[in-house]
From Swiss-Prot:
The keyword Glycoprotein applies. Binds 2 Zn(2+) ions per subunit. Keywords: Glycoprotein, Hydrolase, Membrane, Metal-binding, Metalloprotease, Protease, Transmembrane, Transmembrane helix, Vacuole, Zinc. GO terms for biological process: proteolysis. The chain crosses the membrane at residues 12-32, 416-436, 470-490, 494-514, 533-553, 561-581, 699-719, 736-756, 764-784. Residues 599-608 have a biased composition (Acidic residues). Its cofactor is Zn(2+). Zn(2+) 1 binds at H194, D206, E266. May be involved in vacuolar sorting and osmoregulation. This is Vacuolar membrane protease. Residues 33-415, 491-493, 554-560, 720-735, 785-1029 are vacuolar. Belongs to the peptidase M28 family.
Length: 1029
C-alpha cells in the first residue's frame, strides 16, 4: 500500500503539523512558568551550601511579622547577626566586628581571635571577614517623588559582612585618612537583602529567602579554597518596606565607594522562580548567564526605565544614587500573596530558595572574579560623586525555557535590524528581477499571449487572486480580538486575576477561528495557489515597517525590548524567499501558455472527431472552442456558467465566487496524449500551472516562522500575564493586562496565517467551542478564590482631638463593600467610600471602630501614648517640636503651612543624593528611630519660597511674613499666628491579637476569597494637634 506524503500541503498534514508545532512550544513554556527546577541533592551542592540549614533559617525568620516598627524585627536582626558569627567561626575565619557607621568614621573592634596579640597581628594583614554592626548611621532627606512634599529623618541599624578578597587593599583600609582613594581602587561586589517584612506579612519571599541566601553565600565564600579575588559585602539592611530607608542609610558606609557592582535580591511575589527583574548593562547580564536556571529578559528592565512597572526596590538606590552597576533578582508571582500573611514558608519551597541562591551564587562568583576595567574606571557620564564603575554597554538579554541565556549588545541588535531593513528588500528585489527575466514571475501575472495558431490568443494566469485576503482577514480578526478585550474590561476585568489561562484560551481561539473562517472561506470560493505567498509578502511588509520603528527605539531610546521583531523579520524574510524560489519549479509563462494553447487545439480536433456523427454541427464546435480559450471570468461573471453577466469589465476580484478553470483542467485532462498534464494536477481548482509547485516547502516555512519566534514571544507573554494579571487590586489599570493578552495573541498567531487556509474544519470548530465556553466563563465567573484572593488594605486612625476612631478599608469598592458587610462592627452603619487621592481606581471605605480601640502599649491609655510639645522661637523664624511616643519607632509631623527647612537633634545634614529641597516647601516629616525610648527634638524653619542650600538643609532664609497689602496682610498674620503642627504616630506590630482588635476582626471575618494587607507605614495611627502662636 502506497503511503501518502506526510508533509504535503493538504488539510490533513497542515492541520496536524501546525497544531503539533504550536503545542510542542506552548506546553513546555507553560511548564517552565508554573514549576520551579528541583534543588540538587546535598552531595551535589557547592561547598559550604546547605539547603536544609537555609530552610531552617527561613522558618525561624518567618515565625512572626517583623516590620521595622516591631520588637520581632530586633529578634530577627539578632538571629541573623548570630548566624553570621556562627558561620564564620565554623569555617575558622578570623573576623572583627566594626561598630562604625554614619559620620564621622570612628570605630572600635571586637576580635574573634582568642589573644590580643593575634588580633593586633590580624589588623596588619587582610582579615578573613569584618562584620559591620552599624548603629550610628542616620540620614536626613527629602522625598524625591514629584508633587510629594515630604521630609524624612531615619536612624538605621543595618549590619553587613565584608568578606575580604585576595586582591583587596590590605588591613582595615576604611579607617585610613584617604579612604575614598583606597575604596575607589577596589572592585567589591555588594549583595543585598532586607530583613524587615511588612506588618501584614511574614516575609518569606519578601525578603526572607534572600537573607538566608546571603547566609549561604557567606558560608560558601568563607569555605576553604573559595576566597574571592574581589571583596564581597553581604548587606542585611532594615526598613526597606517603608521607603528603601536601609539602603539609603548604607550610603554613609565607607564601603559604598568600594562596591562597584551589585546583586540585589528581592521579592515582589511569593514563591515560584526568581526572575532577573532588571540589570544596568550587558556586562552584568553576562555575569548572570552563569546561573544554572536563568530566567528573565530585557523587557522588564525597559518597563522599569519607562515607568510601566513602578515597583521600587533597593536596586534603584544603589544604581541611581550611588552609581553601582548590577542586577535585581526577585520573585514575581503570585502577586496576590505579596505583602500578605500568605507570604510564609508554607507557600514557598526549598526549590525556590535554590533558584534564587544558585542565581546569586553564580552571578556573585562571576563578578568577584572580574579583574579588568570592565566594572572599574571613569564613568561614561563623567560624574565624580558616584562610584567609578566604568563604562557600561547597553544590552539585550533573555532566557530560553529557563535553562539557557542569551545576551548581546544593543548596538548589535541595532546593526541586525538595520541590516534587515536594507538587505532584505534588495535580496527580494534581485530574486524578483531574475524571476521576471526568466519569465517565471507568476505573482501579479494576468494574461500572456500564447502566439499559437493563426489567431491571437491570451491565457489568464490568475496572478492577483488572493492578494487582499490577508489584510482583510487580519483587520477583522484583530478588531474582534481587541473588541473582546474591551468587553471583558467592561464586564469582568478581574477575571485575569485568577483565570489567566482562560483569558488566553478565549483570545487565541477567537483570533484563530476568525482568521481561518475568512481565509479558508475566500480560498473555497476562489482557490488560489498564491495565497500563502501573498500572505508572506504582507507579513514581510508589516515586519519591515515595524522594524523601522524598532530601529528608532533601539538607537534613540536604548530599548532592547523589541528584539523579538528582529527574529520575526529574519524568519519572515526567509519564508518569503522560499515562496519566490518555489517559482523556479514552474515553466516560463510563455512556454506554459503555448503548451496550454497546443493542448486546446489537440482537444478540439479530438472533440470534432468524436462528435462527427452529430450531423456536422460545426457552429456548436466552434462556440465550444471559443469558450475553451476565453479569458478568465470577470467580476461580472454570473454564478452559473449558463447565465449572462452584466458589464464589460474584465478585472477579477479576490473574493469573486466563480472560477472558470483553464482548458487543461477540463478538456486537457481527458486527452489521451496529455500524460504530462496528468502528472501535475492542481489542488482544488487552483491555477492550472500550480500543479508543478513543490508541496513540501510549506513545512520548512512553518519551521522557520513558528518555533523560534513563538518561543521568544511566548515566554514574554506568560511572564506578562503572571506579573501584571494581579495588579488591578493594587490600583493599576484594569485594561492593560487584558490588552496585553489581546495584542500578544495577535502577534503569536501571525506566523500561522500563511497556512491556516489549508487547515481542516475540525480544529477551528473545536476552537469555536472553546471560545464560546471561555467567553461565557470569563464574563460570568467570580474573579477571586481561596487560592487567588482579593487584596485590600487596612488602616485605623484614632484622632485624640476629635475623639474619633475610624477604620479605612482601601480597595476596589465593588469588592470592599462585601468585605465590610461580613464584619460585625460596621453592621448597621452607613458606609461611605471616597476616591483614593493617589490611585483613582481604588476607594477608601470607612466605618466607625470606637468599640475596638487599639492597645499598642500594654494597656496604656490612648491619650497618654504621645508626648508632644511645640513652641515658636522668639524671633518667630522657627518652631521647636519635642515628640515622643510609647512602644513605637515611627512618628510623623504635619504642618498647616509649608516649612522651608528642618533639623533633628543628633541628625546629619540633608543628603542631596536622595532629592533636592522642594521650592514650595514641606508639609510632612517622617521621623524614624532605631531604639524605642529616645524622643525626637525637631526644629522647623518657617519662611517663604527660599530653597535651603544643598550643604545645610537646616538653614532657611528669612523672608517677610506680612505683605504690605492691607487687604491680605491681616489674613497672613493670622495664618502665621495659627501655625498648626499635627503629630501622627504609627504602630505596626500585630503579632498579638489584642494589640489592634479591629485588624484581627477583619482577618477573622473577611470572606475566604479576600485577604488584607497594610495600607501605609502603620496599621494604626494616633494623631494629636498643637496650635503654635
Amino acid at each position: 500500500m502506497k503511503l501518502s506524503n506526510p508533509f504535503v500541503f493538504r488539510p490533513g498534514p497542515v492541520s496536524f503539523w501546525t497544531t503539533i508545532v504550536y503545542l510542542a512550544i506552548i506546553i513546555p513554556l507553560i511548564y517552565v512558568q508554573e514549576t520551579v527546577p528541583p534543588a540538587p541533592p546535598e552531595k551535589d551542592l557547592p561547598q559550604g551550601v546547605n539547603l536544609t540549614e537555609a530552610w531552617l533559617d527561613l522558618e525561624v525568620i518567618t515565625r512572626s511579622y517583623h516590620p521595622f516598627n516591631s520588637h520581632s524585627n530586633d529578634i530577627v536582626r539578632q538571629y541573623l547577626v548570630r548566624r553570621s558569627r556562627d558561620i564564620l567561626e565554623r569555617n575558622g575565619i578570623d573576623y572583627t566586628t566594626d561598630l562604625t557607621g554614619g559620620v564621622p568614621w570612628e570605630s572600635r573592634y571586637l576580635s574573634s581571635a582568642e589573644h590580643p596579640a593575634q588580633a593586633a597581628e590580624a589588623s596588619a594583614r587582610p582579615r578573613g571577614a569584618t562584620l559591620f554592626d552599624d548603629r550610628i548611621s542616620n540620614v536626613t532627606m527629602t522625598n524625591p517623588q514629584p508633587n510629594d512634599t515630604m521630609g524624612r529623618y531615619f536612624e538605621g541599624n543595618n549590619f553587613y559582612v565584608y568578606i575580604h578578597g585576595s586582591e583587596d587593599p590590605e588591613g582595615d583600609w576604611w579607617t585610613s585618612d584617604n579612604v575614598q582613594r583606597v575604596a575607589r581602587n577596589g572592585a567589591g561586589v555588594l549583595v543585598n537583602c532586607h530583613f524587615d517584612s511588612v506588618s501584614t506579612g511574614y516575609g518569606a519571599t519578601d525578603d526572607g529567602v534572600a537573607c538566608v541566601s546571603l547566609l549561604q553565600l557567606l558560608s560558601h565564600f568563607t569555605s576553604k579554597g573559595h576566597q574571592p579575588k574581589n571583596g564581597i559585602v553581604l548587606l542585611f539592611n532594615n526598613a526597606e518596606e517603608d521607603g528603601l530607608l536601609g539602603a539609603k542609610a548604607f550610603g554613609y558606609s565607607p564601603l559604598v565607594q568600594f562596591c562597584n557592582t551589585l546583586v540585589n535580591l528581592e521579592g515582589a511575589g511569593a514563591g515560584g522562580r526568581a526572575m532577573l527583574f532588571r540589570t544596568t548593562d550587558l556586562e552584568a547580564a553576562e555575569a548572570y548567564s552563569k546561573s544554572p536556571h536563568p530566567f528573565g529578559s530585557v523587557v522588564a528592565s525597559n518597563a522599569f526605565e519607562r515607568g510601566v512597572i513602578k515597583s521600587g526596590t533597593d536596586y534603584s538606590v544603589f544604581v541611581d544614587n550611588y552609581g553601582q552597576r548590577g542586577l535585581d533578582i526577585a520573585f514575581y508571582s503570585p502577586r496576590s500573596r505579596y505583602h500578605t500573611e500568605e507570604d510564609d514558608a508554607r507557600h514557598t519551597s526549598v526549590d525556590s530558595i535554590w533558584h534564587m541562591l544558585s542565581a546569586a551564587l553564580a552571578t556573585t562568583e562571576s563578578l568577584a572574579r572580574t579583574t579588568s576595567t570592565k566594572f572599574n574606571g571613569p564613568r561614561s557620564d563623567g560624574r565624580k560623586d558616584l562610584v567609578q564603575s566604568g563604562r557600561p554597554t547597553a544590552g539585550v538579554w533573555f532566557d530560553w525555557y529557563g535553562s539557557s541565556w542569551s545576551a548581546f549588545s544593543l548596538r548589535g541588535l541595532f546593526a541586525w535590524t538595520l541590516t534587515l531593513l536594507i538587505t532584505t528588500p534588495i535580496v527580494l528585489f534581485v530574486v524578483t528581477y531574475v524571476l521576471v527575466r526568466d519569465d517565471k514571475w507568476y505573482f501579479f501575472a494576468t494574461r500572456v499571449d500564447s502566439s499559437v495558431g493563426d489567431g491571437e490568443e491570451t491565457v489568464s494566469f490568475g496572478g492577483w487572486k488572493g492578494f487582499v485576503r490577508f489584510p482583510f482577514a487580519l483587520v477583522v480578526a484583530t478588531a474582534l480580538t481587541i473588541g473582546s478585550v474591551f468587553l471583558l474590561a467592561k464586564v469582568n476585568p478581574l477575571i485575569i486575576y485568577s483565570s489567566g489561562y482562560s483569558v488566553w484560551a478565549m483570545m487565541l481561539s477567537l483570533f484563530y477561528f476568525v482568521s481561518w473562517l475568512l481565509l479558508r472561506g475566500a480560498h473555497f470560493v476562489r482557490p488560489s495557489a498564491l495565497q500563502r505567498g501573498f500572505t508572506l509578502i504582507w507579513l514581510f511588509i508589516i515586519t519591515w515597517v515595524l522594524s523601522v520603528f524598532a530601529a528608532v527605539a533601539e538607537d534613540r531610546m536604548n530599548m532592547g525590548a523589541v528584539y523579538s521583531l528582529a527574529f520575526l523579520h529574519t524568519l519572515v524574510f526567509a519564508a518569503v524567499l522560499i515562496s519566490l524560489l518555489e517559482q523556479y519549479a514552474l515553466p516560463a509563462k510563455q512556454d506554459f501558455a503555448r503548451q496550454l494553447s497546443g493542448e486546446n487545439e489537440e482537444g478540439e480536433e479530438q472533440e470534432q472527431e468524436n462528435l462527427s456523427g452529430d450531423g456536422g454541427n460545426e457552429q456548436n464546435h466552434e462556440d465550444r472552442g471559443e469558450a475553451d480559450i476565453a479569458a478568465a471570468p470577470t467580476e461580472t461573471t454570473p454564478l452559473r456558467a449558463d447565465e449572462e453577466g452584466q458589464g464589460s469589465s474584465e478585472q477579477t476580484t479576490t473574493f469573486a465566487n466563480t472560477y472558470r478553470r483553464p482548458v487543461p483542467e477540463t478538456r486537457g485532462a481527458t486527452h489521451s496524449g496529455n500524460n504530462r498534464k496528468r502528472s501535475f494536477p492542481p489542488y482544488e481548482n487552483e491555477q492550472a500551472w500550480s500543479g508543478r509547485l513543490p508541496t513540501w516547502t510549506w513545512f520548512i516555512q512553518l519551521l522557520l516562522l513558528v518555533p523560534l519566534y513563538v518561543t521568544v514571544l511566548g515566554n514574554l507573554a506568560l511572564v506578562q500575564t503572571t506579573s501584571m494579571g494581579m495588579t488591578g487590586t493594587d490600583g493599576s489599570s484594569l485594561l492593560v493586562p487584558l490588552m496585553g493578552v489581546g495584542i500578544l495573541t495577535i502577534l503569536l498567531l501571525l506566523p500561522l496565517t500563511p497556512f491556516i487556509h489549508r487547515v481542516s474544519h475540525h480544529v477551528p470548530l473545536f476552537l469555536l467551542l472553546v471560545f464560546i465556553g471561555t467567553l461565557i466563563y470569563n464574563l460570568t465567573a467570580f474573579p477571586f478564590s481561596a487560592n487567588n484572593r482579593f487584596k485590600f488594605y487596612f488602616k485605623q486612625v484614632v484622632d485624640l482631638d476629635k475623639g474619633s476612631n475610624v477604620v479605612t478599608l482601601n480597595g476596589l469598592e465593588k469588592f470592599v463593600r462585601p468585605v465590610i458587610g461580613s464584619l460585625p462592627t460596621p453592621a448597621g452603619q452607613r458606609i461611605h467610600c471616597d476616591e483614593d487621592p493617589f490611585l483613582s481606581n481604588l476607594r477608601n471605605c470607612q466605618y466607625d471602630a470606637s468599640l475596638l480601640p487599639p492597645d499598642v502599649a500594654n494597656g496604656e491609655k490612648l491619650e497618654n501614648l504621645i508626648s508632644f510639645e511645640a513652641s515658636k522661637s522668639k524671633n518667630g523664624k522657627t518652631v521647636l517640636v519635642s515628640l515622643d511616643a510609647l512602644n513605637t519607632r515611627v512618628c510623623f509631623l504635619d504642618t498647616s503651612s509649608p516649612i522651608f527647612g528642618f533639623s533633628v537633634d543628633g541628625g546629619a545634614k540633608r543628603d542631596d543624593r536622595f532629592g533636592s529641597f522642594p521650592p514650595e516647601g514641606l508639609q510632612q516629616i517622617q521621623l524614624w528611630r532605631r531604639d524605642w525610648e529616645k524622643g525626637w527634638n525637631v526644629t522647623l524653619y518657617l519662611g517663604g519660597n527660599v530653597l535651603p542650600t544643598n550643604q545645610d538643609s537646616v538653614e532657611a532664609t528669612e523672608v517677610d511674613e506680612v505683605d504690605d497689602d492691607p487687604s491680605g496682610g491681616e489674613l497672613k498674620r493670622r495664618a502665621v499666628r495659627e501655625f498648626v503642627v499635627t503629630a501622627r504616630c504609627a504602630w505596626s506590630d500585630v503579632n498579638s491579637a489584642n494589640t489592634i482588635p479591629a485588624f484581627h476582626e477583619v482577618k477573622q471575618f473577611m470572606p475566604r476569597w479576600a485577604i488584607v494587607a497594610k495600607k501605609s507605614v502603620g496599621l494604626v495611627e494616633i494623631t494629636k494637634k498643637i496650635k503654635v502662636t
